[in-house]
Amino acid sequence: MELNKVDDETEEITISTHKKSKQEIKKEREELTVKLETMSLENYISDNISLYCGDCIVEMQKIPDDSVDLILCDLPYGTTKCKWDTVIDLNELWKHYRRIIKKPSGVILLFGQQPFTSMLVSSNYEWFKYNLIWKKNKTTQFLLANYRPMKCTEDICVFSKGGAAAASRNTGNMTYNPQGLIPTNIKKKNSKERIGKMLNQEHHLGKNNKLISNSEYTQNFTNYPNELIEFDIEYDTIHETQKPVKLIEYLIKTYSNEGEVVLDNTMGSGTTGVGCVNTKRKFIGIEKEEKYFKLSKYRITNNL
């Protein structure tokens, strides 16, 4: 197995909250390569962690119906010629996603970039709720800078059978735990002029979902998140599309609860599994590329 190369230069780069030289990173990766060469490809099963090496369409058949609370996955976009970057049959994928996700509370989060984002949305428009936009601190595609804007964002498509509005509370909403809220106790009053026809807050509605005009309510929190989320990329990465642990933890905490089950059916280097361990969730991971399965297994089990 050959991991990504690092130049011999001694230029320092920021990794999380500390700095390492490229020589230090190179040495660490050489040591990791030796460890992974001797690691078994056997599936890893424990009370809270299940890791499978194989094709996700096949391996997901082992997952019981209505047993997964959150699916968080960075599917192959099909934008490169790399062996691992082959688009999975979305129809087959949704057959399993629909079967195994809990309803109505379960949430499915899929990373994407255009034109793959449009493919994802159209693959299950009925369940599509909205897009989050991850803004990075670094741009990519510099070689195309003279021909098009450089990229600094990725989409996160949010799907669920459940609702995402107060009007759907009788039929059940998807899990949503907004992060970063600031407590406040502000008295406010409803009015038809202020609210208009769009009702998306439960405290505006009374019996039969009718507007309670001129009624008072207390706003308990402020600083609600918007659709743009900003997380720095990690420079010391091994997989080509590895996501920051802090970003994954944010998504896990927003769309699931402690003790619940999270699935990543193309887990790559295992960042979702690491995030689940850090946030006290159970994790099911699937990866067909042997070198990345070993890496995921190493990262996750050494983080327990």
Regions found by a protein language model. Give the residues of each.
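Core catalytic lobe of class I
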Residues: 2-5, 9, 13-14, 18, ...
